[in-house]
Amino acid sequence: AIMDTIKDTAKTVAVGLLNKLKCKITGC
């Protein structure tokens, strides 16, 4: 269960970082 939570958190963080990169490159 803990591992699933960590995976979900990692996914959320990764998506957030990707969105920030997209904003820098193409604008939001």
UniProtKB/Swiss-Prot annotation:
Pfam families: Antimicrobial_2. One of its GO terms (cellular component) is extracellular region. Keywords: Amphibian defense peptide, Antibiotic, Antimicrobial, Disulfide bond, Inflammatory response, Mast cell degranulation, Secreted. GO terms for biological process: defense response to Gram-negative bacterium; defense response to Gram-positive bacterium; histamine secretion by mast cell; positive regulation of mast cell degranulation. It comes from the Eukaryota. Disulfide bonds join 23-28. Expressed by the skin glands. Coiled coil: none annotated. It is found in: Secreted. Belongs to the frog skin active peptide (FSAP) family. Ranatuerin subfamily. Mast cell degranulating peptide. Causes histamine release from rat peritoneal mast cells in vitro. Has antibacterial activity against the Gram-negative bacterium E.coli K12 and Gram-positive bacterium M.luteus NCT C2665. This is Ranatuerin-2SEb.
